[in-house]
């Protein structure tokens, strides 16, 4: 009996001791997602600004939620409902509302092309009468997009632009030049998708009377082949057009198609340019703005194109040059008075500027030796612009709002680290996604003035798991380079670090453009090596 009690006591001691010890991180822990922090994703704000929708892949439904409570309030539609009402069985993996939110464009059987681009079979579901129409191309289509009035859908099929009239199929239209490995209309080539970070190459005008689109001629671009290792025993070979440095790029032109007259206009730019990294309609139905770059990417021009009777009028609206290169962004916003907001690094730092319709500066909205890192938008009701900036430290991000004249600036977040905002339509609410180097993603709902309303996601399970491991915090520091410029860096030392000993060092550096790796934010993988 005494022996048995001794064994029990020893066993309890070992168990308690094991519970008190923290685990060491293994490679398996890192890459199987032990420290993964979940975040809300796929939220789409509805027109009313107080509800959002989420695609529920497990249930095959599009669900409606309240921002204020986080509770589900309705199911917009489900695959089961579509089958019951139309007799057609579909499993959708993407969706898009029309402007009035009474029709849905549903993507099915989606397959990837490159990093961002894909093909799908598309259906249009009418929420009012429960009718279902399929885009009538024989194969999968790209980039289907409902017109502003939702009576037409435009898409790319076999490298050409097509319009399907949902009321009268006899009025379907095709335009642009398309041929595999040579001509593309409405989509973009590999260079634009990868280097300019967009893959949709056409846009409806605000009232749906015109479509502006890209036309590519890649017939002279050299091909590149690459072995792709998939599920098979042997790799498949992927062959595509790829211009290496100094080789020929695609010849690109911008066109405007008049949907009512079924007439195509090529935009004639009066200067020689290499790239058109962005096009965007203004608030006017017949005004398009095209951005152009030279091959060195140090000279940018915004061109205003106006559709007139019998043709197009093109004039230079804004011009900017840089001694090195100019970054491309999606921060161009047109206001109702035809003025526009633009971000530029022309004073040495990226800031917000307000220009009139002639491209003349009204005022610089933000100033200082720091960067505006994101522009969320302009709320015309309150007169505030919302943006993210690295004002306090390049390692961190904070959320601000400021009036159009540059006055009334407010910092909206309280916690120090990495903050990002996701605003509702109309800027009534926003979700703040916060983290730091030692704090997993923590998401909260706020009013537009910064007042916190509720916690959405605290990643408590991840925090509990981290507490069981022997972890060291990141230490941030600065290292001078050859000319004395301080470079930000971080280091993670063992918990029992002894400065008198020598240790092996694992260096991690990525020097690509537009990439920052020294950040005070949570990284579930690289911070746990």
Task: For the regions a language model picked out, list residue spans one by one.
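Beta-propeller folds
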Residues: 20-423, 428-429, 437-441, 445-446
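Serine-hydrolase catalytic core recognition
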Residues: 199, 223, 280, 285, ...
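Alpha-helical structural elements
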Residues: 8, 26, 185, 235-237, ...
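Hydrophobic h-region of N-terminal signal peptides that target proteins for export
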Residues: 7-19
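Bacterial N-terminal signal peptides that target proteins for export
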Residues: 1-7
